[in-house]
From Swiss-Prot:
Residue ranges constituting the F-box domain according to the UniProt record: 9-55
Name of the protein in question: Putative F-box protein At3g17560
Pfam families, A to Z: F-box, FBA_1
Coiled coil: none
Source organism of the structure: Arabidopsis thaliana
Length: 413
């Protein structure tokens, strides 16, 4: 069998170079990864930037669901009738990532997707950017080791012809925010009949405000890592005062969060964006009522690197609404509704998604695959609700890895 592969490969490379490039430019990235080691000429071709540009322009970029589970990446797929979910290791048993500073396998606890790249945080609190299909990595220097109480998002400067990647670092005060809300008088109870009761006190506008750019000790907490200079710098910009209600996501170089502030004692929601070109923030509209209940769940996802998707679940009705952007730029966004699901009939299996949830949209089957801190996978659609509970939770030397799912479009570089 080995000789047959070698002979076929040799015959292929007897063809003119432009014909070879044309053939391989139509092969999906995931297949190229599997065959690149068959010969040196093919390996060199896949490293050639001219071929990479041609492949990017001509190939249909496949849309995948990736899952971070137990410190490793997996691909997620459904069987043809959509009743079962298959989870397969992305690296097929290979060691996923080697830390060059310790020469041991890197244990990944968090991941952020941008443009086919994964910004990963390891258990040693180091940052590495990984292309899981090409195997390329970029590690930040050890002296730039990240902090446990910081969050990171990856984006790029759209003003450059070639993407100039940057990392935004900001204080992750989620646990402090929870404690502040708890002390402010929030109680969450379930009655004997299974109803959800929410008791709140009146909050003044300053009682549980979180400033995105100010650390608990008062100093500016925003920093930018520029890949072109391989260095960090402090970011001196006007930062919004309020609360991030979702994980961040990246679309076409910009980062986005669901954001909440108080205006005259009333909750005010918006889509907060960070433009890596101008290194500034911008507020955009959200599709649901801006005065939604403050304990509802909001989450963002990216669909095919073309649209943002926003999930909103009311804590009063448990109804889930999922929206997708029709258009989005730096100053304008329009939305269309993708899905509405009432989860109340499925109690007591599910009460409320947390604001640390993640989800993936399957447009063809019109379902959302949701992961939460209970380490279960919830599949919700207009006429269905399923939960997969066969996922176990690992704790590695005190570092946890919550189940996370996101859409992913692979790229060669």
């Amino acid at each position: 069998m080995r000789s047959e592969i070698t002979r076929e490969t040799k015959l292929l490379f007897d063809l003119p170079q432009d014909v070879i490039e044309e053939i391989f430019s139509k092969v999906p990235v995931t297949c190229l990864r599997r065959i690149r080691s068959t010969c040196k000429r093919l390996y060199a071709l896949l490293k050639d930037r001219g071929f990479i540009r041609k492949h990017f322009a001509k190939s249909a970029r496949q849309y995948h669901a990736l899952m971070l589970k137990n410190f490793r990446f997996y691909s997620v797929s459904f069987n043809p009738n959509g009743t079962e979910m298959d989870v397969a290791s992305l690296f097929n048993g290979e060691r996923s990532l080697i830390d060059p500073y310790s020469s041991s396998e890197a244990i990944i606890s968090q991941a952020f997707h941008c443009d086919g790249l994964l910004l990963c945080t390891t258990k040693e609190n180091r940052l590495v950017v990984l292309n899981p299909f090409s195997g390329q990595t970029k590690w930040l220097q050890p002296q730039n080791r990240c902090k446990i109480d910081e969050a990171y998002v990856l984006g790029y400067d759209n003003s450059d012809l070639c993407h100039s990647y940057k990392i935004l670092s900001f204080p992750d005060l989620y646990e402090q925010e929870l404690e502040t809300i708890k002390n402010a008088g929030r109680d969450l109870d379930v009655t004997p009949e299974g109803d959800l009761e929410l008791k709140t006190d009146d909050f003044s506008s300053n009682s549980w405000r979180r400033n995105l750019g100010v650390t608990p000790h008062g100093g500016l907490g925003l920093k930018i890592y520029d890949f072109s200079s391989n260095s960090w710098k402090k970011l001196d910009v006007i930062t919004p005062e309020g609360c991030l209600k979702s994980y961040g996501v990246s679309l076409k170089g910009n980062a986005y969060w669901v954001y909440m502030s108080k205006r005259r004692g009333v909750n005010d929601y918006s889509l907060l964006s960070f433009d890596f070109s101008t290194e500034s923030f911008q507020h955009l509209c959200v599709p649901f009522h801006q005065e939604a209940d403050c304990f509802g769940t909001m989450a963002l996802s990216v669909v095919r690197e073309e649209h943002l998707s926003l999930l909103y679940q009311s804590c009063e009705t448990l109804k889930v609404e999922i929206w997708m952007t029709k258009e989005i730029d730096t100053t304008f966004v329009s939305w269309k509704k993708f899905l509405t699901v009432d989860l109340e009939p499925h109690l007591p299996h599910l009460l409320m998604f947390s604001c640390r949830m993640s989800f993936f949209i399957d447009e063809e089957k019109k379902v959302a695959v949701c992961c939460d801190r209970d380490n279960k996978v919830h599949v919700v659609g207009e006429d269905e609700y399923r939960v997969s509970s066969g996922f176990y939770f690992l704790d590695f030397e005190g570092i946890t890895c919550c189940l996370t799912v996101f859409g992913y479009v692979p790229r060669l570089v």
